[in-house]
């Protein structure tokens, strides 16, 4: 199979990640923070080492990183933990439903108000689109780093600066950028970062994280056992226990730890360079095919991540993807859990076909995809 659906989840996983998962099942299937025996302590140490690796990669304090089942849960923690009745929030027109639906639910229930900022391939215009929506009660700006549909990259550093100049919390959804684009909480002015493990960090499914800068106060939407302060009914104030109730996914965390090592060993910049070059090649070939409709300008790494949406002739996107699937090429068709993005780009009638490479994707596979598509 030629796998070009890495925006959904990277596949294959590195052998080191597979080995780590097996090792975790054999040696670290103990409840961390719940026992003083050696195996429990060793498990706790392994989990903290993963926090330290995330801290090194993204710049957040290790103790401010909490593990979640996925990025969607992390985003819900961020949005619902920050906003209070009467608050206003700004999101973008390229948000995944992981952002749009929690915000809309709070709005529908009369708790908050929100506005949506347009994306422009002119960086200054994008920043101004956010700026003009700021109100006295704006509490947060939530922004995807890279669109999961069209690959559009937001200028998060500048948007974060704008937020901080106005006393606004800046939350970044890094589902499509963690492990692919460089991210640093300080230089990028990020207050809260949410990301999955199973995409650009090459971890197993079922593990993600939320990371906070110091002095960011966040409420809870889940309370329970944390292994600490058990004789108090109130959820602990300190991180990461504040956002980690219940038994952790040790296997996923240790797999994530190995995934981070894999990415760090190759370097984020080299992974991005490989994927960018593949996407430039694919884009150039598709642009010469009169039957292909592309929705973004010629591939430019200043504003595009290695994600590409297209359509073929006037076919429904599912028909194109089904044809490719019959030829053993995996991609994603439809609306990609992103109503706002498809509405913004005018593809809400038939969706798009999305392709996305990984560090394991080969030029020969991309060439075969291009040649097979011509036969549709």
Model regions: which residues?
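Pyridoxal 5′-phosphate
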Residues: 1-376
């Amino acid at each position: 199979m030629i796998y070009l659906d890495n925006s959904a989840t990277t596949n294959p996983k590195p052998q080191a990640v597979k080995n780590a998962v097996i090792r975790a099942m054999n040696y670290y299937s103990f409840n961390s923070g719940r026992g003083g025996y050696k195996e429990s302590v060793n498990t706790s140490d392994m989990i903290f080492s993963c926090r330290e690796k995330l801290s090194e990669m993204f710049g957040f304090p290790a103790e401010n990183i909490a593990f979640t089942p996925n990025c969607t849960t992390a985003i819900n923690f961020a949005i619902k933990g920050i906003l209070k009745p009467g608050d206003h929030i700004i999101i973008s027109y390229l948000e995944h439903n992981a952002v749009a639906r929690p915000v809309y639910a709070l709005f529908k229930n009369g708790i908050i108000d929100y506005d949506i900022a347009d994306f422009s391939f002119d960086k200054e215009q994008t920043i101004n689109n956010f700026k003009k929506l700021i109100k006295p009660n704006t509490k947060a700006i939530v922004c995807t780093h890279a669109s999961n549909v069209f690959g559009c990259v937001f200028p998060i550093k500048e948007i974060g600066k704008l937020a901080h100049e106005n006393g606004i919390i800046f939350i970044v959804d890094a589902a499509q950028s963690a492990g692919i684009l460089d991210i640093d909480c300080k230089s990028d002015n990020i207050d809260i970062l949410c990301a999955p493990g199973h995409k650009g960090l090459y971890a197993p499914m079922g593990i993600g994280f939320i990371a906070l800068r110091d002095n960011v106060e966040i409420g809870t939407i889940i309370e329970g056992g944390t292994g600490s302060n058990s004789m108090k009914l109130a959820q602990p104030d300190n991180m990461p226990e504040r956002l980690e109730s219940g038994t952790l996914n040790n296997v996923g965390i240790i797999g994530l730890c190995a995934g981070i090592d894999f990415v760090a060993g190759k370097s984020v910049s080299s992974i991005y360079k490989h994927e960018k070059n593949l996407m430039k090649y694919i884009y150039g070939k598709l642009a010469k095919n009169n039957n292909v409709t592309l929705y973004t300008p010629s591939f430019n790494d200043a504003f595009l991540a290695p994600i590409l949406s297209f359509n073929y002739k006037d076919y429904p996107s599912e028909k194109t993807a089904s044809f490719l699937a019959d030829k053993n090429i995996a991609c994603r068709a439809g609306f990609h859990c992103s109503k706002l993005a498809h509405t913004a780009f005018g593809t809400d009638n038939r969706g798009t076909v999305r392709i996305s490479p990984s560090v394991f994707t080969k030029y020969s596979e991309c060439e075969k995809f291009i040649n097979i598509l011509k036969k549709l």
